[in-house]
Amino acid sequence: MAGKVRSLVWTGDSLRLIDQTKLPAVFEFVECRRWQEVSDAIRTMKVRGAPAIGAAAAYGVVLGAMECRGETSERLIAAVAAVIKELAQTRPTAVNLFWALERMENILKAQEGKPAAAVIEALRLEAEAVAAEDVKACRAIGTNGASLIKNGDGVLTICNAGALATVDYGTALGVIRAAFVQGTKFHVYAAETRPFLQGARLTAWELVEEGIPAILICDNMAGWLMQQGRVQLVIVGADRIAANGDTANKIGTYTFAVLAHHHGIPFYVAAPLSTIDISLDSGREIPIEERAAEEVTHLLGHRIAPEGIGVYNPAFDVTPAHLIAGIITEVGIIEPPYRENLAEALKKR
């Protein structure tokens, strides 16, 4: 899929998104012509993955501005500022969303007094830059991390940190793609990732599309595979990385990190620098999104749990930095001590 079809495409007057809720059964695009449709797509996970929702939100701002093209510059800027605030409420954990919206807000503030058409064009150019930079970063992440995968390795990953989770190519799957293209002989264990099944539906689909040898497993099989010596490396994505290296990612990631540590298996995070939130001292400060009970009690529209049962459904967990061997970024692999090295890496952005 990578390089062939992007997860999101700007058409000039709309944002086309792959509807990730329908994969792998149906490959279908959602056409967003209003910012509210982008907001809904992010909330309902038609588009998901930290870098992808950041880029989608940036284009959502452009759509919000285009809806006000007949207004005065002053009114347009006020309306777009309100749109940015609304888009920031869609999902709380992925920092790329807020990073992209902050960029759009900075551009908006710089347009004061300029004609409405100029404001819209400046916002469009910034959204295009956000998307282009993500593609470039993911390609570099793949290149920088590919050598970690050796011939004969079993590589475990969770959720979907591939082309679908970014504008194109992917973070954790970007590393896997790059190693595969370089000719390394290995196979991937894709954890299904309950309850939303991003691993089974999305990662497995990407791997099959690319022809990368892969095996789908249930999440609770990971420890047994490690004990049997079938896993030599774990690579995951990230939704937010605190200043000390603590990393929020899809629920279940922390479990894999603990298991990997117990079995002496290197555990790596792959993420662009935009995922690093230096304003948060540690993972304790990362807000964790809780999603609807129906994601746990229902499967493909059918109830699988009894009525009346309580449900706890956090979308993310936090892996402590001491369990992470390295963070693969577009400027290289960052290793401990994370507080100093992450701050230094951000200077290269």
Can you name each region flagged by the protein language model?
Residues 30-46, 78, 147-155, 298-308:
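Short, hydrophobic/aliphatic alpha-helical segments
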Residues 170-181, 257:
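Histidine-anchored nucleotide/phosphate-binding helix
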Residues 18, 56, 60, 98-100, ...:
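Short beta-strand segments
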Residues 96-155, 186, 190-234:
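Ligand-binding beta-strand-loop-alpha-helix segment within the catalytic cores
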Residues 185-186, 191-349:
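Conserved phosphate- and dinucleotide-binding cores of soluble alpha/beta proteins
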Residues 31, 35-38, 50, 54, ...:
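Generic structural signal for well-ordered, non-membrane alpha-helical segments
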Residues 6-114:
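Long amphipathic alpha-helical segments
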Residues 44-60, 91, 97, 157-168, ...:
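Conserved phosphate/anionic-ligand binding catalytic regions in large, soluble enzymes, centered on
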